[in-house]
């Protein structure tokens, strides 16, 4: 997938880039796999903002993605590679031999006409999904389950991949994109290959309007707020923040302050932290 630039007709067009989407084969999604999405504006059921900078944006339909890949030993043919506005990766529409249609996350190299299979006896081939127990050590994988049968939760965004490092009894060691090495049970499933749309991370948004179309609202600096809105707010003109170190809007230390719980259950499954050398 290539990235294209634009003629500098405006200051924003000078810097703006976008994907060419040459892998996309259709612009019409499968209607039976669409559901409506209601905008929340970043608010919870009580109307309170729980996620800042969310609101507006283009209307979307949610594509129902098969993260479980539990239809075993039935080959599925790739009918189309499609754009999904709800994620950075592309998705593939597959039709099983019995006629059922499903969307899956499209890996790099998957093309229209290819066949993918799920199950313990599947070949080690891009797009196939099988338990980690049956995947050779060193294989590049994505779409990884944390609990068997729950559906993939890890390594699902554009251009990402993990690597199977070792297998020891009921657990495997998987190196995640962050560099963290983690224990994952061998009965959990993973898909072979790298997630599609690898150039997503080098795209330059270029202008605020593109972010607004994506449903992202502006981020205001705390130093220009009032003191009742932010710890950095208030004062005459460009005042110092008035604290030994920066603070979040809720008064907690910002910039490097650890917020993860010290006694989290999943700590026991982390073999190597992402910051460890």
UniProtKB/Swiss-Prot annotation:
Keywords: Ribonucleoprotein, Ribosomal protein, RNA-binding, rRNA-binding. Residues 219-277 are annotated as: Disordered. One of its GO terms (biological process) is cytoplasmic translation. Signal peptide: none annotated. PROSITE patterns: RIBOSOMAL_L2. It comes from the Bacteria. Pfam families: Ribosomal_L2, Ribosomal_L2_C. GO terms for cellular component: large ribosomal subunit. InterPro entries: NA-bd_OB-fold (IPR012340), Rib_uL2_dom2 (IPR014722), Ribosomal_uL2 (IPR002171), Ribosomal_uL2_bac/org-type (IPR005880), Ribosomal_uL2_C (IPR022669), Ribosomal_uL2_CS (IPR022671), Ribosomal_uL2_dom3 (IPR014726), Ribosomal_uL2_RNA-bd_dom (IPR022666). The keyword Electron transport does not apply. The keyword Transmembrane helix does not apply. One of its GO terms (molecular function) is RNA binding. Belongs to the universal ribosomal protein uL2 family. Part of the 50S ribosomal subunit. Forms a bridge to the 30S subunit in the 70S ribosome. One of the primary rRNA binding proteins. Required for association of the 30S and 50S subunits to form the 70S ribosome, for tRNA binding and peptide bond formation. It has been suggested to have peptidyltransferase activity; this is somewhat controversial. Makes several contacts with the 16S rRNA in the 70S ribosome. NCBIfam families: rplB_bact. This is Large ribosomal subunit protein uL2. The gene is rplB.
């Amino acid at each position: 997938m290539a990235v294209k630039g634009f003629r500098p007709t405006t200051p924003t067009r000078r810097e703006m880039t976008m994907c060419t989407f040459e892998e996309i084969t259709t612009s019409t999604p499968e209607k039976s796999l669409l559901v409506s999405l209601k905008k929340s504006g970043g608010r919870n059921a009580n109307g309170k903002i729980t996620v800042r900078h969310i609101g507006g944006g283009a209307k979307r339909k949610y594509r129902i993605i098969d993260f479980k890949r539990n239809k075993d030993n039935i080959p599925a043919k790739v009918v189309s590679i499609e754009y999904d506005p709800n994620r950075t990766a592309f998705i593939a529409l597959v039709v099983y031999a019995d006629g059922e249609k499903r969307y899956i996350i499209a890996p790099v190299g998957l093309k229209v006409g290819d066949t993918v299979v799920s199950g313990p006896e599947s070949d080690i081939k891009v797009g196939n999904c099988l338990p980690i127990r049956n995947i050779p050590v060193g294989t590049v994988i994505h779409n990884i389950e944390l609990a068997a049968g729950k559906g993939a939760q890890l390594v699902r965004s554009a251009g990402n991949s993990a690597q199977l490092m070792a297998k020891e009894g009921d657990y495997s060691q998987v190196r995640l994109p962050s560099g963290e090495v983690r224990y994952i049970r061998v009965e959990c499933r993973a898909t072979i290959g790298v997630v599609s749309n690898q150039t997503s991370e080098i795209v330059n948004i270029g202008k605020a309007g593109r972010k607004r179309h994506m449903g992202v609202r502006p981020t205001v600096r705390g130093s220009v707020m009032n003191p009742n809105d932010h710890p950095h707010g208030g004062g005459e003109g460009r005042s110092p923040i008035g604290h030994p170190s920066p603070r979040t809007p809720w008064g907690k230390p910002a910039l490097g302050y650890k917020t993860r719980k010290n006694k989290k259950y999943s700590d026991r499954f982390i073999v190597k932290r992402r910051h460890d050398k």
